[in-house]
């Protein structure tokens, strides 16, 4: 999990994203929505030396970690956590916890290292092993290398939120929803040679190519370099 996150964070850019000002307050920001204030509703802050050091997504609505969506404090209780929602209890509704031996009930991101779901990138065990799982890597099964499977609809990739088949049309895709067409509401396409090269989230149905894009990395060294999360619903920022 840490390797996947590291790869995503280290090389991704956003198209028409809020500026990552390299030397400014949002330096190394991983997706910022500046609707009302600097960090207001921010969805990704890495300040390297602050309280949220190595944070992968902070929502500072009421307190420092209040409703945080990604904290890695390395030595704290949430060590290795990939997303914490502290609404009522420490792990309450956690969106990614690796406690190695504790109860991961309702967790949407588990690394059990030696269990059946080894290498799983998100498990919800509410009713069965893979029931509504949002991330399975079984290495030798049909969903090999899958980065998110939801089997609710009845078919293998039905409403899948992440498929990597290496040789198919969605080669290297980081999130596919095949409801009506190949890229229909896709949440992450990387075709390596197209306009969306290295894209981490494209929704091509609303009217324009980048409309509602959730992260574009064109590696061209633009101002928004390394941004990972854009919502252009209201014309950008």
UniProtKB/Swiss-Prot annotation:
Q: Which pathway does UniProt place it in?
A: Mycotoxin biosynthesis
Annotated signal sequence is 1-19
Q: Is Signal among this UniProt entry's keywords?
A: yes
Top-level lineage group: Eukaryota
Give residue ranges for the propeptide. 20-22, 234-237
Coiled coil regions in record? none
**Which UniProt keywords are given for this protein, alphabetically ordered?**
Signal
Q: Does the keyword RNA-binding apply?
A: no
Task: Quote the PTM field.
Answer: UstA is processed by the subtilisin-like endoprotease kex2 that is outside the ustiloxin B gene cluster, at the C-terminal side of Arg-Lys, after transfer to Golgi apparatus through the endoplasmic reticulum (ER). Cleavage by kex2 generates 16 peptides YAIG-I to YAIG-XVI. To process the precursor peptide further, at least two peptidases are necessary to cleave the N-terminal and C-terminal sides of the Tyr-Ala-Ile-Gly core peptide which serves as backbone for the synthesis of ustiloxin B, through cyclization and modification of the tyrosine.
**Gene ablation phenotype (knockout):** Impairs the production of ustiloxin B and its intermediate ustiloxin F.
Q: What does this protein do?
A: Ribosomally synthesized cyclic peptide ustiloxin B precursor: Part of the gene cluster that mediates the biosynthesis of the secondary metabolite ustiloxin B, an antimitotic tetrapeptide. The ustA translated product contains a 16-fold repeated peptide embedding the tetrapeptide Tyr-Ala-Ile-Gly, that is converted into the cyclic moiety of ustiloxin B.
Q: What is the name of the protein in this document? A: Ribosomally synthesized cyclic peptide ustiloxin B precursosr
The organism is Aspergillus flavus (strain ATCC 200026 / FGSC A1120 / IAM 13836 / NRRL 3357 / JCM 12722 / SRRC 167)
């Amino acid at each position: 999990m840490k390797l996947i996150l590291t790869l995503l964070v280290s090389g991704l850019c956003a198209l028409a994203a809020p500026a990552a000002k390299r030397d400014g307050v949002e330096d190394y920001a991983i997706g910022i929505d500046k609707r009302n204030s600097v960090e207001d509703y921010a969805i990704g802050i890495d300040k390297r030396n602050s309280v949220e050091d190595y944070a992968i997504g902070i929502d500072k609505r009421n307190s420092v970690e209040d409703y945080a969506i990604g904290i890695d404090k390395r030595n704290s209780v949430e060590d290795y956590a990939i997303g914490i929602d502290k609404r009522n209890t420490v792990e309450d509704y956690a969106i990614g916890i690796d406690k190695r031996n504790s109860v991961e009930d309702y967790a949407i991101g588990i690394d059990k290292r030696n269990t059946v779901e080894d290498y799983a990138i998100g498990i919800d065990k509410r009713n069965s092993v893979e029931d509504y799982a949002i991330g399975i890597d079984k290495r030798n099964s049909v969903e090999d290398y899958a980065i998110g499977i939801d089997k609710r609809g009845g078919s293998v990739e039905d409403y899948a939120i992440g498929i990597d088949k290496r040789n198919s049309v969605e080669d290297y895709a980081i999130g596919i929803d095949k409801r009506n067409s190949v890229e229909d509401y896709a949440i992450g396409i990387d075709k390596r040679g197209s306009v969306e090269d290295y894209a981490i989230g494209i929704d091509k149905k609303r009217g324009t190519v980048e409309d509602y894009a959730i992260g574009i990395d064109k590696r061209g060294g633009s101002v928004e370099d390394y941004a990972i999360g854009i919502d252009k619903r209201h014309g950008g920022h």
